[in-house]
Amino acid sequence: MKVNSFYPVILTEQIEASAKFYREHFGFEIVFEADWYVSLQNQSSTPSFELAILDPSHSTIPQGFRKPVDGGLILNFEVDDVDAEYERLIVKAGLPLHLDIRDEEFGQRHFITSDPNGILLDIIKVIPPSEAFAESYVDPV
């Protein structure tokens, strides 16, 4: 299969608040907006990144699946300066902190916050892994 695009779609009844959150804190811009669906795009890098927000009661969702996302989802944001993002998002903007900033032996410096829907957001800077974890990577690091 040739994939032309791939992006998460968050099912939530908080369409407007969710779109505002990702625009204000993560630099996304609206590319399509209806009362039941918002398509967002972040063009700060190449390739650009997309995220959509959809009312779970919309007719395009199969009947048995029409419910808001409720846990079990983490969106990872890899950034150049995780410490600066921590300062901006946690210290200044006051977003909730679920996992304080720390280095992981498998090759990440990160912290975890969440969006208005309770979706976890893992803000990550890739760092060199420990020797033990370096062997687990397919490509040498």
Please identify what each model-predicted range represents.
Residues 1-6, 29-77, 86-114, 126-141:
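Vicinal oxygen chelate
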Residues 12-14, 105:
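Conserved beta-strand-loop-alpha-helix junction that forms the acyl-donor binding cleft
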Residues 18-23, 89, 118:
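Conserved active-site tyrosine of GNAT-family acetyltransferases
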Residues 14-15, 80-82:
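Helix N-cap motif at beta-to-alpha junctions
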